[in-house]
Amino acid sequence: MLPCFTRKPVDHPLGFLVALSGLLMQLMSYGIDNSYSIFSDDMHKDPSLGYPSVTTISLGNSVSLGLSPAFGVLCGFLVDRVPPRLMMAVSTLMLFAGLWLSSTFAHNVTAVTFSYCLLASISSACMLSPGAAATSSWFNRYQGLAMGINFSGGGVGSAIIPSLAGKWVVAYGWRKTFRLMSAFCAIGVVATLLSARRAPPKKEEAGPSEYDEGQERQEQGEEEQAHTDEENRNNNNSNGETTPARRGLHTHKLNPWELFLTMFSRAFLGNFFCWLIFSWAFYSLIYVAVPYVSSMGKAGTVYADISPIPTDIASTLFTFYGVFQIVGSILVGWLATGTTNEFAYVLCATIGGIFCAFLGFCRSYVAFALLLCVIGFCMAGMFAVMPALIAERLYGPNLGFYMGAVFLAGVVGGFSAPPIQAELQQRHYGNYTYVCVFMSACMTLAAAVCYITMWRDKRVRIVSAAAEAKLA
């Protein structure tokens, strides 16, 4: 976008076009990345790869999904200093190159991991923080809704690309399917052209009503942080220390040491652990969904007596999952705008945890579809609210870094969940019940962490501020 278009007041409608660019980037990236487990069986039977084991193939999924947050920290640091569209262009190019390199030159699963999965991981990192940071710069009042639109792209991609990939891999094999999927990278080109960070308007050009409303919203957030900031200063001053990093968090670009110090604040740690615990459930579901459903009727498993569900049919469940991710992202974003981000997150995590437990009892296609609709809705809502939670507490010129640093927690779940879950179900004769219980526990614990570290603390600050205002 040209500077004359980006120099707009807070909450300007043009910001929704930037949110749309984030949606398109996530459609491309997550739609392709989430399809990887669909190729597991075809790669396992491929003589050109040496018939690799399922666990070995799952390591590629770990690299693709798990290392992305690690690269995201660097990308978050860079997006505070370079235009978001540059990062998005790199993301599109890396994903396109990975699909073609692996499908053309890979002759073992290790080559697939390094030629596709590693590049896909970097690609995902280059689009997530830039898209979220660019969108958040346009909004205060409607930030929850805008983030919901931005993060609904994963649902759109999951509804479209995996179902197509499931049909293509049966008809053409994984190599040609990779090349066909590369056509979706054209979406990334369009998204790159639409993305831009908002530039503050000149005072004489800014409409007083819209601009002042955005400023009032930001000042309210600053007041909510005042109580916590004062406690941190008092604690540090009692030890003979000063807190320049904490004082300048929202107003100055911090140096690496100051950024490191702020990572021990309650605002950062609360967001970090919410994402850390949730990532276990999310990446477990992405990896096991299709293998779990397609194991129905498979000999040698506890589901041998169940009516079989072929892989190409099982992959279509991502359509239901993806559609309800779209609905969940937008509706939960709207709910967060009308209530609080913390309430929306806790509600989605609690309901999602309950239905993850029920997933272990499913045996039919219809039952899987119904539960994945609810789980997709809840997980998408958590995805949409998470950046808003980060922006609400860590807003300012360092927001891109904090986005990437919080998403770094996903390394734990993304990198370790797929091989652990693959090994877990194999040790129990293909029984996925343990995986479902684990996902349920993680979702529930994420809700508890959000309530303890953010929602309850926010309510206490608001009540205290209201009491002080009443006494004054």
Curated annotation (Swiss-Prot):
Topology check: give the Cytoplasmic ranges.
Answer: 1-11, 80-85, 130-144, 197-271, 337-341, 387-399, 456-472
Its membrane topology? Multi-pass membrane protein
GO biological process terms on file: riboflavin transport
Which terms are listed as keywords in the entry? Cell membrane, Glycoprotein, Membrane, Transmembrane, Transmembrane helix, Transport
Q: Residue spans with biased composition (Basic and acidic residues)?
A: 214-233
Q: Which residues lie on this side of the membrane: Extracellular?
A: 33-58, 107-108, 166-179, 293-315, 363-365, 421-434
Nucleotide-binding in keyword set:
no
Superkingdom is Eukaryota
An annotated GO cellular component:
plasma membrane
Where can this protein be found?
A: Cell membrane
Q: Which GO terms describe its molecular function?
A: riboflavin transmembrane transporter activity
Predominant place of localization: membrane
Family listed: Belongs to the major facilitator superfamily. RibJ family.
What is the protein named? Riboflavin transporter RibJ
Q: Which organism is it from?
A: Trypanosoma cruzi (strain CL Brener)
Task: State the organism's lineage.
Answer: Eukaryota, Discoba, Euglenozoa, Kinetoplastea, Metakinetoplastina
